[in-house]
A protein has these predicted regions:
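Short, conserved charged micro-motifs
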Residues: 61-65, 119-125, 184-186, 241-247
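Short hydrophobic/aromatic beta-strand micro-patches
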Residues: 56, 113-117, 178-180, 235-239
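Vicinal oxygen chelate
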Residues: 42, 48, 55, 93-97, ...
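Hydrophobic, helix-prone linear segments
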Residues: 22, 38-92, 96-108
């Protein structure tokens, strides 16, 4: 799979990659820098962190319960009025679910890759997801591909990857957030979060926190048309002693724009990345 239009990504987001693929016998990426190296290279960018991946949901509680069951994460009340999931391991960000009356229109620009340790483990993950309300979907994947493509109760696409995928090795169960996006937007998020690029070839990019956790990847052209506000977006925030305005100014300088989606007077700043994807810059925390 990889792309949700059925055309596989060349490398980064190809859900059908096999361990025997010559491209992926070894992870084809820049080596993850050490802490000292990371500070030398990205130290001036360490002014915000990825706080949450936010879902617009018609039924936030139901969707949160689904993902809590699939991922094994703890469900808690969110201080902003939604529902949040706290990860069972230190991936660095949470999931948050907020009410929305908007219906899903077309594929999301982001989807999830969940890994498997064995074929039995893959089957168990699929069965668990189906039992919680997922459904099989056909996005043009080929019969010989080993991954399983599903959608959550509100249509959010995700793939359960077969065992032996070298690209996702050591990334954990929730291994990748695979996005439709340009090379420019991959470079933007590398600078925005201070996460190094672990792939940057053929207009495909991927980043990963120096602490580990899932990769975030962008598959390059052609880009999906944007149909209204994205149902998934990032919340980022400066650290406790940071400066929200300074962070917003920095993000504008590397390609973001401030946008108005009718948010009114709120404490956060709504912005869009170079591909037009909305995200929010919260107050320091």
């Amino acid at each position: 799979m990889g792309r949700l239009d059925g055309r596989p990504f060349q490398r980064v987001n190809d859900c059908g990659l096999r361990a025997s693929s010559p491209t992926f016998d070894k992870e084809p990426c820049m080596p993850k820098p050490s802490g000292a190296c990371f500070l030398r290279r990205y130290g001036d960018l360490m002014t915000c962190h990825l706080l949450a991946l936010c879902f617009d949901a018609n039924d936030p509680l139901r969707l949160a319960r689904f993902w809590a069951g699939v991922l094994g994460w703890e469900m808690v009340d969110d201080p902003e009025g939604g529902v949040a999931l706290l990860p069972s391991n230190d991936i660095g960000f949470r999931f948050e679910f907020f009410p929305s009356q908007e219906q899903k229109a077309g594929p999301n620009r982001m989807h999830f890759h969940l890994t498997s340790t064995s074929l039995e483990d893959q089957q168990q993950t699929v069965a668990r997801a189906l039992g919680l309300g997922a459904r099989h979907i056909d996005i043009g994947q080929r019969p010989e591909e080993g991954h399983v493509v599903l959608a959550d109760p509100e249509g959010t696409e995700f793939c359960v990857i077969e065992p032996g995928n070298n690209w996702l090795a050591d990334c954990g169960f929730f291994a990748e957030l695979a996005c439709n996006g340009s090379q420019k937007v991959g470079h933007f998020w590398s600078e925005a979060l201070g996460w190094p690029l672990v792939w940057d070839q053929d207009q495909e990019t991927a980043i990963r926190s120096p602490r580990g956790g899932p990769k975030i990847s962008w598959g390059g052209p052609p880009l999906m048309p944007k149909t209204g506000k994205n149902r998934l977006h990032f919340d980022i925030a400066p650290p406790v002693h940071g400066d929200q305005k300074a962070e917003v100014d920095r993000l504008v300088s590397v390609g973001a724009t401030r946008i108005d989606i009718g948010q009114g007077e709120v404490s956060w700043v709504v912005m869009a990345d170079p591909d037009g994807n909305e995200f929010c810059v919260l107050t320091p925390r």
